[in-house]
Amino acid sequence: MAAPRRYCAGLVRALLGARQVGSHAGREWLAPPGCLLGNQARCVSCVVGSTFSGPLLASASSRYGQDSALDRILGFSQPDSSLVPSVPAVSVHRDEQNLLLVHTPDMPENPRVLRVVLLGAPNAGKSTLSNQLLGRKVFPVSKKVHTTRCQALGVITEKETQVILLDTPGIISPVKQKRHHLERSLLEDPWTSMESADLVVVLVDVSDKWTRSRLNPQVLQCLTKFSQVPSILVLNKVDCLKQKSVLLELTAALTEGVVNGKKLNIKQALRSRSSTHCPGPETEGPNAHSVRNPQRIGWPYFQEIFMLSALNNKDVNTLKQYLLTQAQPGPWEFHSGVLTSQTPEEICANKIREKLLEYLPEEVPYGVQQKTVIWEEGPSGELVIQQNLLVPKESHVRILIGQKGLLISQIAQEVGRDLMDIFHCDVLIRLSVKLLK
């Protein structure tokens, strides 16, 4: 393959020297004027870089002025806890992140733990909900399907309780995976994650009138195969419904009129033929229906139902508190400073891909190859990143750059803002668009 031909790059200083506003528990960052260096895309030299890995015994707090879980492990003094956000930052160094993941959990005397699998059709809102539960946008989100390509893990730690979230790709059928040449992870990860689940959260997008009236067939298969795992139903995007009465009909259909072994008092007649049978909580259970029923549209073994908008903090907090109460006595799996199992480079690549899916039309974003060439600490302690975006067509180059370089600059700026919130440090990011010959 010939060497890629360099066209240009968007150069953005993402929120360098940003100021902090709002409460410490929920930080918000405002970019100072001029953080976007020019409207036109600028060419940059493509120097091959390497991942920077600072000394593990150097204080991350002194480098970036942030709380570091690694510092707590190594015994460095910490700032006043009242000045530290409740949600931990992710280290910008792969070695530090990996060390934290394998470190002995700093669990309390009576620890509690819960492993939660988020299950649903593509674009049901699983990653958005995961981000809201975690308090950080560590998982990629877009309106296009298959934004999440493989299983990702997030950790919520509050007091003596740890909740581990497994954000799975939208569940698909083997036929669709083969037809569209999708990764095996999209097919396998939702199923493998169920093997270690303590609770399943089934997410349904009620704004999609074409799919909302029945559970996804693959979701039903998964629930049936792992019927011993408790499950709850979450009706997402309820803010998009003009007629709230629709929620009653959907609840009746998706639960077959039964929640936690009790028949729902809903007058709307169920149209599913399988709804005529109402199992009792003691006489029957999920194992009685281990054989798949092709006519089934709902699952009568949900323990609870939640109706929410994943963008509404109050709604999400109600679900979060429920998850915390469902945790059972047991050892933690991770140190309290762990927010996600992803490496910092994976988070960055996913964030860039999220913006590509959001802003590029049709099939264009799916053909972009990403290659990180620089990941290092700058002279002022900022994180310096350069990623090359390789595209197969010259027309795609023009689309990605945008008029006068505005689109590539906007993408870089938004990615930088998100990364600054995740890493708690200043970010300088360069995106270089190249054509593959």
From Swiss-Prot:
One of its GO terms (biological process) is ribosomal small subunit assembly. Residues 308-310 are annotated as: G5. GTP binds at residues 120-127, 167-171, 236-239. Residues 236-239 are annotated as: G4. This is GTPase Era, mitochondrial. Residues 112-330 form the Era-type G domain. The modification Phosphoserine is found at residue 173. It is found in: Mitochondrion matrix; Mitochondrion inner membrane. Probable GTPase that plays a role in the mitochondrial ribosomal small subunit assembly. Specifically binds the 12S mitochondrial rRNA (12S mt-rRNA) to a 33 nucleotide section delineating the 3' terminal stem-loop region. May act as a chaperone that protects the 12S mt-rRNA on the 28S mitoribosomal subunit during ribosomal small subunit assembly. Residues 167-170 are annotated as: G3. One of its GO terms (molecular function) is rRNA binding. Residues 120-127 are annotated as: G1. It is a peripheral membrane protein. The gene is Eral1. The keyword Transit peptide applies. Residues 270-292 are annotated as: Disordered. Its main location: mitochondrion. Residues 146-150 are annotated as: G2. Residues 360-437 form the KH type-2 domain. Keywords: GTP-binding, Membrane, Mitochondrion, Mitochondrion inner membrane, Nucleotide-binding, Phosphoprotein, Ribosome biogenesis, RNA-binding, rRNA-binding, Transit peptide.
